[in-house]
């Protein structure tokens, strides 16, 4: 059994152990992908994120 989630009407995550949500749509895994030090494509992902300004260092500081 793995933790799954689906989005409700308000766009909030609802966590469940079921494979389908109440409307019959499949749920998504709530676990992140495994990290591998042998990842051949990490350089490409970082390049794409840098190009589109998605890196955390390119985001404005959060207001506390």
UniProtKB/Swiss-Prot annotation:
UniProt region (Disordered), positions on chain: 19-40
What keyword terms does UniProt attach to this protein? Answer: Nucleus, Ribonucleoprotein, Ribosome biogenesis, rRNA processing
What SUPFAM superfamilies does the annotation carry?
Nop10-like SnoRNP
Cellular location(s): Nucleus, Nucleolus
Tell me yes or no: is Glycosyltransferase among this UniProt entry's keywords: no
Supply one GO CC term from the record. telomerase holoenzyme complex
Pfam families in the cross-refs: Nop10p
What InterPro entries does this protein's entry cite? H/ACA_rnp_Nop10, H/ACA_rnp_Nop10_sf
Record's keyword annotation contains Ribonucleoprotein: yes
Q: What is a GO molecular function of this protein?
A: telomerase RNA binding
Listed under GO biological process in this entry are: primitive hemopoiesis; rRNA processing; rRNA pseudouridine synthesis; snRNA pseudouridine synthesis; telomere maintenance via telomerase
Gene3D superfamilies the UniProt entry points to: H/ACA ribonucleoprotein complex, subunit Nop10
Q: What is its main location?
A: nucleus
Its function, per the record, reads: Required for ribosome biogenesis. Part of a complex which catalyzes pseudouridylation of rRNA. This involves the isomerization of uridine such that the ribose is subsequently attached to C5, instead of the normal N1. Pseudouridine ('psi') residues may serve to stabilize the conformation of rRNAs.
Complex and partners: Component of the small nucleolar ribonucleoprotein particle containing H/ACA-type snoRNAs (H/ACA snoRNPs). Component of the telomerase holoenzyme complex.
- Could you say which protein family the record assigns here? Belongs to the NOP10 family.
Instruction: Tell me what this protein is called.
Output: H/ACA ribonucleoprotein complex subunit 3
């Amino acid at each position: 059994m793995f933790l799954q989630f689906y989005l409700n009407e308000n766009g909030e995550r609802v966590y469940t152990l079921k494979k389908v949500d109440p409307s019959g749509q499949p749920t998504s895994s709530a676990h992140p992908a495994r990290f591998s030090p042998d990842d051949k494509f990490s350089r490409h992902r970082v390049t794409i994120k840098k190009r589109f300004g998605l890196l955390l260092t390119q985001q404005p500081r959060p207001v506390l």
